[in-house]
Curated annotation (Swiss-Prot):
Keywords assigned: Ribonucleoprotein, Ribosomal protein, RNA-binding, rRNA-binding
Any GO MF annotation of the entry: 5S rRNA binding
Pfam families found in the cross-reference section: Ribosomal_L18p
Gene Ontology biological-process entries: translation
Function per UniProt: This is one of the proteins that bind and probably mediate the attachment of the 5S RNA into the large ribosomal subunit, where it forms part of the central protuberance.
The protein's name: Large ribosomal subunit protein uL18
HAMAP family from the UniProt entry: Ribosomal_uL18_B
Amino acid sequence: MITKPDKNKIRQKRHRRVRGKLSGTADRPRLNVFRSNTGIYAQVIDDVAGVTLASASTLDKEVSKGTKTEQAVVVGKLVAERAVAKGISEVVFDRGGYLYHGRVKALADAARENGLKF
């Protein structure tokens, strides 16, 4: 019997593989992206201390209107502003195993425009 591969399991496997090579420090934390069917979530994480330094998501009150891509742009802007306010200017971008396209790319571009370097 032919079975269809589970896209999320493949993404999780890809994410685990990339996370083995990618890590955030206090000087250059990791900007992690998680994308669900309804929302998008971004966190700036110091992996050495195991602490989230800044975060933003579509659950925030500032991000209620628009298409999913427009919401991703607002989330990118918010996470960048919150990170810059805490003195973080450079990050390592972790796309979470997703393709660098669509909502993930929109979030990354908005974060770059608002002061994060990666």
